[in-house]
Amino acid sequence: YQYMYNALQHNNGNGSFSNISQYTGMAATDWSWSTLLADFDNDGHKDVYITNGLLYDIRNTDADKQVAQYVSDFANDWVAKHPNAGDVKLFDILDIDKTIALLPSVPLKKYAYKNNGSMQFSKVSEDWGLDHASFSNGAAYADLDLDGDIDLVVNNINSPLEILENTQDPITHNFVGLQLVPTQDIPNTSGAKVTLFAGQQVWYKELSATRGYASASSQNIHFGIGKNTAVDSIAIIYPIGGKQTIKNVSINTYQEISALINSRIAPTKTDKNNTIGENSLHPEKIFNRFFTIITP
């Protein structure tokens, strides 16, 4: 039997990955839906927020047995009372609400982990006021009040959504906010790779709204830069192959950056001898997917 646990894949930088979920203490977070990685305290490290909640616990084996027994008893009783009814679909006569009510429905707490650097994380759900129980699935982040820290919007099943304001007081760390504005040359900025340089530190992000479960977050790019009071430069690489370099970057504010190309990036050459060619042949394994012959 294999116990399920989360996977957190660390990019080793050499084409391989290592699962460090146990090492970071984030291997077990109940039934998890959205996992958001963002710098919620602007210290320069991405933190982790996880929504939780399963409206009906269909994994509960005891409840599964109760449901099976209830359905069997119901069907037998109905047939006894309607002997001449003919063929009837079970779902046309079964009390679905009563059946589902046999399944456990317990709200679960959400999880939040602070990134302390060097792949060390601390569970801060309670400290950050994010540990209340609910049936939550989708979640998105954005700086809704433009005060420099990232807020959360969480979808809850059968109850109103939550808008969770980040109330850092005072804000002890600095940030850089960017909004890439499409232009005629670059009508779509999605997929842009943004690298920020400040002193000896480097931050990297890719512009993609899709995050979490069935959710989309803000298209603004937000960097927490900790105690840094200045930024050397920002380099942006667009999917079409152009590069844009930005100097004189302001901190603790959001800047609109018109997507432009300062220089072109030469396409990467591929050795055709290392690719799959016309001589490659896939041998199909013959297998009958519908019938299996069992030999006594």
Residue positions per predicted region:
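Beta-propeller blade termini
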Residues: 10, 33-42, 137-144, 296
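Outer-membrane beta-barrel proteins
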Residues: 23-28
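Beta-propeller blade signature
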Residues: 4-12, 111-115
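Residue-level marker for isolated small/hydroxyl-bearing positions within beta-strands
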Residues: 11, 49-53, 153-155
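Gly/Ser/Thr/Pro-enriched helix-cap/hinge segments flanking short amphipathic alpha-helices
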Residues: 102-109, 115, 120-136, 140, ...
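Secondary-structure transition into beta-strands, especially the periplasmic turns and strand N-termini
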Residues: 12-16, 39-46, 116-120, 144-148
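Intrinsically disordered, compositionally biased low-complexity regions
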Residues: 15, 40, 53, 63-67, ...
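Short, conserved, GDST-rich strand-edge loop motifs in beta-rich repeat architectures
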Residues: 1, 54-104
